[in-house]
């Protein structure tokens, strides 16, 4: 319960101290995916959660990664707290009814969806480091081997500007059970390390990794690449950098963008377009935006607003790109989180925290 309550307070402080943007938004809600009244809550005890980061499992299904998860609607009644959790579906988001979850990782049939891998949960991370919780960033799978990798952030604390211990990787041979690896990207003492929140996209022999600071601070977005079959070897990562004359790989990273970034999401679409979505958490215009490019190194387009704040004392954030999205009209599929903004907000069907499918156009 402390996890969820603290996160709610923090998100409210960061993003709802400023007015919502009034710019025209492209994306509209299609279906609420999480709740006690949805299959997520009825079948697997995922009644309140956030994120819902989708990644292609290359077996006809998409895995959806969730953060702090409880089996009750409200923080005050929080039960069965765990993170991360994964639900699965092979239903195309373009279907008339939207996405419906069909199974959960770590459980056969119905039953409480368990944590995907170890979480210190107000204790030891397993290596002697204090850990408040673990939050997933992204997932990737490799059909050549059947292996899966999840990038995550180990959180030290949730203060006004939440502080991670490090970014890390969890590994699976089947996409059902995962183990944390020793590979880590440590945060710095100033909490400004730009490699703490990840999004990953494969293209050919390379996996491209886009990273930002935690806590929606102003800062750079960095780009690295790594051979797909060497992701667990930190020495194989190559930075994309500017040397004063030109850009190139195998250099210290230089910022490809700057801003108040929420969790980034990057996907290469079927037509070859690269799409990026994130929460622009600037103090004047908090909204979910998209950019496009022909390749991972850019240049990236100007921002297009996809989702504005609803203006009903709730908080919308996330905007994770479904891997089956396309560049066609109304075929950008986003997973958007919704938190109520105050403890005395009127009850709604969505409860305190939920994830919904939005549909938009790049």
From Swiss-Prot:
Keywords: Glycoprotein, Signal
Practical use: Notoamides have been shown to exhibit antitumoral activities. Notoamides A-C show moderate cytotoxicity against HeLa and L1210 cells with IC(50) values in the range of 22-52 mg/ml, but the IC(50) value of notoamide D is greater than 100 mg/ml. Moreover, notoamide C induces G2/M-cell cycle arrest at a concentration of 6.3 mg/ml.
One Pfam family, short name: DUF4185
InterPro entries named in the record: DUF4185, Glyco_hydro_beta-prop_sf
Domain of life from the UniProt record: Eukaryota
Residues of this chain annotated as glycosylated in UniProt: 157, 190, 280, 338
Signal sequence, renumbered to the chain: 1-22
UniProt cross-references to SUPFAM superfamilies, sorted A to Z: Arabinanase/levansucrase/invertase
Function: Part of the gene cluster that mediates the biosynthesis of notoamide, a fungal indole alkaloid that belongs to a family of natural products containing a characteristic bicyclo[2.2.2]diazaoctane core. The first step of notoamide biosynthesis involves coupling of L-proline and L-tryptophan by the bimodular NRPS notE', to produce cyclo-L-tryptophan-L-proline called brevianamide F.
Name the UniProt record assigns to this protein: Notoamide biosynthesis cluster protein J'
Source species of the chain: Aspergillus versicolor
Source taxonomy: Eukaryota, Fungi, Dikarya, Ascomycota, Pezizomycotina
Annotated gene: notJ'
